[in-house]
Amino acid sequence: MEHLTRIGIVLPYFGKLPNYFPLFLTSCRHNPTINWLVYTDSDQEMDWPENVKVTKTTFDAFRARLQQNFDFPICLDNPYKLCDFKPTYGDTLAEDLTQYDFWGHCDCDLVFGDLRHFLTEEVFQDHLRILCCGHLSLYKNVPEVNRYYRTQPYIDYQNVLQSPGAFSFDEWPGLSECWLRDGMPYYGKLIYDDLTVGVEDFRPINITPGGFIGPYHNEPDESRRFRKMKNILYRWNLGKLERCWVEKGQLRQEETAYVHMQKRKMSYDPDVISGLSFLIVPGAFLPDRELSAAVLQEFAPVSCSMATRIRLLKDGIKVVLAEVKNIGRKGYCSRSAIVNHIKTYWSNTYK
């Protein structure tokens, strides 16, 4: 039997769990060869899968544990600041991760598909880091990778960990940019759907200012293909997640690794959602049903208000201006990437 890379994904979460957290856990359960390590103060009743290891702890106790690893006072006043500490977990939580070949961090506003279908053994053999966003990243569990965040001349990690506010240290333009600059072997293919924030309908690539567009430097053709999809919804069925959309009047379906529903309110009624299959549509989880182009047009209409269009256009201008300044920086951005950004924002604004 082939040896599978052992994976442990860290998820600290303090406060009330999201209303659709049971569906997140269901999607974890259907990835039985991957473990999740959840640190939480929640007493909510949950059907915890065997591959989700729960450590009950308070936010103050978790902060104290992280502090033990640094000889300077860290600033961790609220759970959101944990985003900047994600790249440190291989170092700060090392005792909990010794059994894993790769460790990672994730968010819980996700529904996973079949991760092993996309993250093959060849991917793990050839890379030190898998994916490059805060909602899911995996790292080879070796000292030079676990302490990589301490070694960067581009970013003062002490300043990041000592300061309030968010630095996006876990992704772009934080350590992910450092990996790119240093030519470190990381796997950054667009195997997931990171939904655009602040847009009513589903668009599978997130377009915001501040560097989140960074991963799409890798595959401009793929991101361009995503932008042409309309009437998008998702079907989860027995561990498989499919993106469904309408193209030239026809229903199209394609498997994806996971969908990230950042900053979206999603209604969820556990009494009507089967644990075997369900649909994810803008604003809700629904029971599964037979799909057609007409069904997608009904439940996932293309919708973008004028206020949203104006915001997207402003965000696009900000990012393009920032990227113009980056032309020529080592391993970062090219003129072709600038052109791709302009096309991205134009498409998302006037789609």
Describe the function of each predicted region.
Residues 1-23:
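N-proximal low-complexity "stem/linker" segments adjacent to membrane-targeting elements
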Residues 11-13, 38-40, 106:
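Short beta-strand/turn micro-motifs composed of small residues
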Residues 25-35:
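Short, acidic, metal-binding catalytic loop of nucleotide-sugar glycosyltransferases
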Residues 41, 45-96:
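Active-site-proximal specificity loops/subdomain of glycosyltransferases
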Residues 86-131:
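GT-A fold catalytic core of metal-dependent nucleotide-sugar glycosyltransferases
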Residues 135-143:
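Short glycine- and hydrophobic/aromatic-rich loop-to-beta-strand nucleating segment
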Residues 148-294, 298:
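Catalytic core and acceptor-binding pocket of nucleotide-sugar-dependent glycosyltransferases
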Residues 294-351:
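Boundary detector for helix-to-coil junctions that initiate low-complexity/charged tails
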